[in-house]
């Protein structure tokens, strides 16, 4: 569902498109009640009848709304517009960690600062029983002020993760295929080892 400038979603007025991905279109909008700029993620109309995508979208909203941490994208509200669900988030200015990495090597101190902030955000999520399950440079945003923010909890698991084949008490993990090297296996503690 492409929204045009001036479209109203409750108290939110669309200003401009910011981007689109597999799970939705993102717009810059104005919250007319609180007089602030926000980002609105709208599930595309073509997916409105897809119950699995709707479930994942609502799961992401619930997972992120349960968290309140400076290194996790803030969610302010959810709603529906002409049958399409939307999520209202804080508006970020900067670039993804992936985009920063593409610019070339960064100073070690800065890389460690980002890593530390990401770990703090993940720890806060884990403390609330939320496991991200799709952490990659594309899902980390670095603001103009240098703060790393974890995005896209669309694959988040809200309860302790247990998969077929994982023994009781083991932590099952999931990583993006692009983050796993051929012949390598991700272990329970997140380290990669050669497959025997």
Label the predicted regions.
Residues 1-196:
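Conserved ATP-binding/catalytic core of the eukaryotic-like protein kinase fold
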């Amino acid at each position: 569902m492409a929204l045009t400038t001036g479209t109203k979603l409750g108290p939110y007025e669309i200003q401009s498109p910011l981007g689109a991905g597999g799970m939705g279109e993102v717009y810059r909008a104005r919250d007319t009640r609180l007089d602030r700029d926000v980002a609105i993620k709208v599930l595309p109309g073509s997916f409105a009848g897809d119950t699995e995508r709707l479930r994942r979208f609502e799961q992401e909203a619930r997972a992120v709304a349960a968290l309140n941490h400076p290194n996790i994208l803030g969610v302010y509200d959810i709603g529906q517009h002409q049958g399409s669900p939307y999520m209202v988030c804080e508006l970020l200015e900067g670039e993804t960690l992936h985009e920063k990495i593409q610019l070339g090597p960064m100073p070690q101190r800065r890389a460690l600062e980002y890593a530390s902030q990401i770990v703090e955000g993940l720890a806060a999520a884990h403390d609330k029983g939320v496991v991200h399950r799709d952490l990659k440079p594309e899902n980390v945003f670095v603001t103009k002020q240098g703060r790393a923010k974890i995005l896209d909890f669309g694959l988040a698991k809200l309860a302790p993760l247990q998969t077929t084949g994982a023994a009781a008490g083991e932590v099952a993990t999931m990583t993006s295929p692009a983050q796993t090297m051929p012949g390598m296996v991700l272990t329970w503690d997140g380290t990669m080892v050669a497959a025997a």
